[in-house]
């Protein structure tokens, strides 16, 4: 028998390998760290619920092999505990307001909703996903989109998670939601080096000085080659 491995993330790719007779078995390591239920989800036709590995190698190879520390996972914060947290339902009404619809905000909102909290997610932009969705526009980083896409899909399925997009988290709005807990997940901004005058030029119209985020917004303006 022949087994093949190597970041086989898509169930269709795995099935095609087996159907062609290129291998008898598919071996999977990082994919099962990201989602231990990968195989079960494929078997029962729930591929859209798979939390795919993004091949960052930070928590698995980086921690376990490089640093001899316990395995962690960028996309699966429950890698060492499983979904036991879902059994710990809140025993009284609890309103949670999460500000920021990036991957951290989505994870916080989904987790709160899954344990029974009435949860409100507020995102100032039109789309959820935050920096992960932005960075995934870089050609060599496209697979990063799998993570925010999975998180958005997970969030949309929760009946007690209410999502506001194109909405600023004003004090009035947050107060009107009667929060018991407020989570600040507004993300980060690129670090700039201490160069005199840089702040006056960066990301300004008419200059060629840009942060990586502004550069990504202008990808279509650059030559394809």
Question: Where in this protein do the model-derived segments appear?
Answer:
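Flavin-dependent oxidoreductase catalytic cores
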Residues: 1-99, 103, 107-119, 127, ...
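Local beta-strand N-terminus motif with an aromatic residue
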Residues: 23, 94, 161, 179-180
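Phosphate-coordination loops involved in phosphoryl transfer and adenosine-cofactor binding
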Residues: 92-95, 166, 224-225
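Beta1-alpha1 glycine-rich phosphate/pyrophosphate-binding loop at the start
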Residues: 98-162, 166, 191
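NAD(P)H/NAD(P)+-dependent Rossmann-fold oxidoreductase cores
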Residues: 156, 172, 186-187
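A conserved short coil-to-beta-strand element within the FAD-binding core of flavoproteins
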Residues: 164-177
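Glycine-/small-residue-rich beta->alpha transition segments that form the dinucleotide
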Residues: 179-181, 185-193
